[in-house]
Amino acid sequence: MSDVAVDKHATSLVTNLIYQVNGVLPKDISLHHSLVNDLLMDSIELIDLLMCLEDIGVTVHESELTSELTVGDIVMHVESIH
């Protein structure tokens, strides 16, 4: 995924939600970071993030919650509703 092709608003929204859920500063988050392996999100934080996303109309199925799920994957979900 090219960083240039990604909507900056969607990226900002996702990185700020991640910050709210687990405290990693948005400036330290890359689209290529794995939520589990790189950002060290635990299962409770992942569910919190899913709930925050659902509040803004974005659905990520629990079956997608693997250690391979990246910030960029979440951004693509957000972009798909706008």
What are these regions (language model features)?
Residues 2-44, 49-82:
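Phosphopantetheine-dependent thiolation modules in NRPS/PKS and related acyl-activating systems
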